[in-house]
Amino acid sequence: MSADDRRYIIRFGCPDRRGIVARISSFLADAGGWIVEAAYHTDRDTGWFFTRQEVLADSLPFGADELRTRFVSVAKELGAQADWRISDTAQRRRMVILVSREGHCLYDLLGRVASRELDVDVTAVIGNHLELADITRAHGIPFFHVPFVADQDGRAAAFGQLAQLVDAQRPHAIVLARFMQVLPAGLCAAWAGRALNIHHSFLPSFVGARPYHQAHARGVKLIGATCHYVTAELDAGPIIEQDVTRVYHRDSVSDLVRKGRDIEKIVLARGLRWHLEDRVLLHGNHTVIF
């Protein structure tokens, strides 16, 4: 990345009030900052204000750490409840992918990374089965096998090993690419806002296992997929992206699975891109995508 492309991204939220935009803008302008992208939104139901701003890094006489230090006083002025993050696009994004046996989402992500459609470093793929080890290693990416067993102690040990492997990578994103294990509450909390799941239904419909079978039994005319952040409540985390495709009376369960996999790949790629570009602002169980 050239110096001309480097940007600092400010994501900010607080209870809405007069003068928020003016205060942040004047803070940046007084320091010589050049805002090249800005977006704002107020949720009228909750009274919460959201903004995302991109500032040219070379327009400021100091770096990201100093920007964060100086912004603390601005955030305090705008309210004790203010929630904010400042990221630096020069910092390479790192990603770990968790998989089981189904490979369509992994294949798609690896292809998008290899073609530079997704600007991220995949530092590891971790699977509870070995079926996807070869394709991972063919892309020059380490594959780690963490088998899960049925007994409670064995599962706890497996999740402990999984946590150590993931945390060692210091990832910005942890993608559950059809990883068919339910994360314990402790990991959900530790990875909050970083762990993304792709669920093969248009949530909140057909939560849990075998959603295509559920959809076929219900006789739906649309099926979909949902990319969401992982929480302790199964398939109930903040939704980042969704999409649907039409199905017909003649479609079998296998047809639904085939059509659904296409949607899963697209929805996961979109949601992941927005996450990596710091375009997602979280508030409770809701997201704002700028």
Range-by-range predicted roles:
Residues 121-123, 142-148, 194-199:
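Short hydrophobic/aromatic-enriched beta-strand-loop microsegments
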Residues 120-131:
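Short internal beta-strands
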Residues 128-129, 154, 172-290:
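Donor/substrate-binding cores of folate-linked one-carbon enzymes
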Residues 95-104:
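Short, glycine-rich nucleotide/cofactor-binding loops
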Residues 137, 141-169:
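Adenosine-nucleotide cofactor-binding segment
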Residues 103-114:
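Histidine-anchored nucleotide/phosphate-binding helix
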Residues 1-93:
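A conserved regulatory-domain signal marking ACT and ACT-like small-molecule sensing domains
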Residues 14, 99, 126-127:
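Short beta-strand/turn micro-motifs composed of small residues
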